[in-house]
Every structure is written in structure tokens, then in C-alpha cells.
Amino acid sequence: MKKQTIITACTFAAMTMATPAVFAVQPAMSNHVCASDAIKKDNRPVESKRLFRSKAVEEQIQRIQQLLKNQKLSWMFTNCFPNTLDTTVHFRKDKKDGKPDTFVYTGDIHAMWLRDSGAQVWPYVQLANEDKELKTMLAGVINRQFKLINVDPFANAFNDGPIPDGHWKTDLTDMNDEVHERKWEIDSLCYPLRLAYHYWKTTGDTSIFDAEWIKAIQNILTTFRDQQRRDGRGSYHFQRVTDRALDTITNDGWGNPVKPVGFRNTSGSSGGLNSSSLAWSA
């Protein structure tokens, strides 16, 4: 890998280290969600049904419970903080190379979003040095993310292995059996870099930066350059039979024409498809 490419990739990773978004909860919702009867109930799965258990996470829950005097906030943290581990994390060793491999469901959909999975496990990175198993699981998420990027850097969500009759198989784009959905969203490539950088800065573990990672970085940079659209319309096209305009792309799936000024075009967003662009250096 060329020195310039490595520097570019590392610089990009550093620039993606933004503070996670904080979502506001409407006052009207808070009383409904945290009714007096609700805070007496443990909504976590029984221990035998939890997908992954971390000693460090359980100890953190106990520490925070001691700090929070508000009973409702304590209940919310106790049930929400471990939810990703309890219900969405599927950890194993890769059958081919024996490395940690973690597939993270995005809630009730049995598929892994690159952006979502990076955000879902983000709060646990701070505890990685306190729990070897947790650290290994996080490395597995990163390993899986970069493998998926190498399957298709334009895809936003992937199946846990090939599924010939996937839910969005009829979308008019370059689908394959491992892809759950192929909406080109620039944050799908930013979040894995952000997670890998933060994990490395926290743990010092460089095992994740292997040949798969180098290939993924090359694919990411190639994709970004392609979507600058300096010459032509780029490689990505997408159409879906739908009654929602946000779920498909105009101009026969190629999107609105843009002036080639160095911006990276991104056809998708977290709320659906559109023709927005993200500023980036030329």
C-alpha cells in the first residue's frame, strides 16, 4: 500500500472522530416510557437468553446505578446500556481465518448495517481494556465491517451469509446474495473507520489492521473518488419499485447531475435516499 494512501486513510479516520449525537426526548414521551410501574420491571432478557455477557459492562451498570439518584434514569440506563449485547451481538470465530467475527443485528432486522453497528457498540469501547472477551468481540465487529466493505463498498446493510431471496433482491442495482440493501450512504464507510480508530486509540491493538483492512481502505478511497464524479456519472445506480420518492433515485437511478468540484456525492441518508452531497477535499 502506498505511503500517501496510508496517510490519507489515517487522516480520514482521525477526522471522523466526532462526538456521538445526543437525541432529545420529548417531555410528553418521558412520562409514558418511564411510568412508575415500568421502572420496577427489568426489561432485559433472562441471563440464559442474553447473546453476549460482559463482566465490565455489568460492573459499569452497578457503578452508574450508585451515581444516579433519579430512579427513572437509573432504570433507563440499566435496561438500555447493555441492550446491544443482550439482543443483537452474534459473536464467533471466522471459519476461514479463525479471527474474531461479530455480526450485529440492527434491532429487529436480522441484517447488519455498517453505520448502525459502529454506533451500537461504540459505548463499550471505553471498557475494552477491562474485559478481554469484550475487547475480542469489538475486534470482531471491526473485522466483520471491513470484510463487508470488501463485499460491496456501496452497500449499507448485509446479510449474515448469502441469502438468494433477500428482502430487497428486486432492487435495480448491482445486488448480490450477501447484500441486504444497497443504498450508497457515505456514513456507511465513515463509521467503521471511526470505530476502528477509537478502538485502536483505546486498546493499542493493531491486530485489526491486516490485509483485509488494507483492501477495505483501498476500496473506500476508490469509492470516494468515484463519487466525486469528475468524469461522468460514477459507478453507482439504484432504483426501487416504491410509492415513496425517498426510496428511489431519479434520472434512471443515477441521481441528479452535479458539478465536479471535489464534493463526494452520497445518494443515501439515514432517513432514506436523496441526492445530497458531502464536502471533502479535492
Enumerate the predicted regions with their spans.
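Bacterial N-terminal signal peptides that target proteins for export
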Residues: 1-10
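N-terminal signal peptide c-region/cleavage motif recognized by signal peptidases
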Residues: 18-19
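Low-complexity, Ser/Thr/Pro/Gly-enriched N-terminal "stalk/linker" regions
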Residues: 27-115
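Solvent-exposed loop and edge beta-strand segments that line ligand/cofactor-binding
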Residues: 41-52, 102-117, 135-138, 147, ...
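Well-ordered alpha-helical scaffold segments within catalytic/enzyme domains
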Residues: 56-69, 119-132, 191-206
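Long, well-ordered core segments of solenoidal/helical folds
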Residues: 80-95, 137-156, 214-233, 265-268
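The feature captures the catalytic groove of carbohydrate-active enzymes
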Residues: 107, 162-202, 208-209, 228-282
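Membrane helical hairpin/interfacial module
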Residues: 107-166, 170, 177-181, 203-214, ...
